[in-house]
Amino acid sequence: MGGLDVVRAAHLHPSYELVDWKRVGQNKLVALVRSALVRVKFQDTTSSDSNNQDTSQNALSFDTQESQKALNGSQSGSSDTSGSNSQDFASYILIFQAAPRATWVFERKIKLALPYVKQESQGSDDQGSNGKGSLYTTLQDLLVEQPVTPYTPNAGLARVNGVAQDTVHFGSGQESSWNSQRSQKGLKTTPLPMPSPALSSIRAARTGSWMKVDRCMNPWIRPRRGRGRMRALGKIRKKQRRKMMPRWWGWLEVVRLEVLLVYKAMARTVRG
């Protein structure tokens, strides 16, 4: 799938081009596209002509006026489905689903907050992501903006492996960068919601009750008395069920077993 096919499948403006792509598993393809009409304008704070703009803010800004002129001059008769009439040339993360016959079907697109500007001096890789490309940094910024909650991506996987969410994304020994990057962007720390029992405990197959992970005993390491906490709870539940059942229930079970044995014996004689 080429860059032009990716843009056409997502119904974007022809000015969009493929910047980076990454394959996730066997059934997902994630691509990063940006518009070639986006220009970066540098505002000199020492000059007298400041175009009536606030010079105390960032010196770099996105010049959408020149982009709009180019759009109206060259693509005046084309249909616009990406919302470019509102001078919005934001970048998108496109997600594709694998289909039969080695094809990819467009699934959805995620709009980024700021347009992506290609930095030629750093030699960004346009053919694919090698772990240091633009798509990697963009996805990392998106993960930084998310608070650490049980509902964030890979949260359950991190708890199963016994590590924290920030360690999964930033590596061991770099957990402090999570809070520092959030503070630089002015993001507030969202309080954690009440965790469900499925995140911190497991459910017994026989008893159906929730049990804390640290209280579960390893089935291979058997204690002296009994075979672990799980089997002990199973015996307790079985005794409780016997107390709740009427007395004639046991006799009914014996009759059922006898009928089953007679049926099996008759089947054997018929086969013989």
Curated annotation (Swiss-Prot):
Q: Which portions of the sequence form the region Disordered? A: 65-84, 171-196
Q: Where is the composition biased (Low complexity)?
A: 72-84
- Looking at the UniProt entry, the stretches that span the membrane are none
Point to the regions of Polar residues compositional bias.
Answer: 173-187
Family assignment?
Belongs to the MgpC family.
Stated name of the protein: Putative MgpC-like protein MPN_366
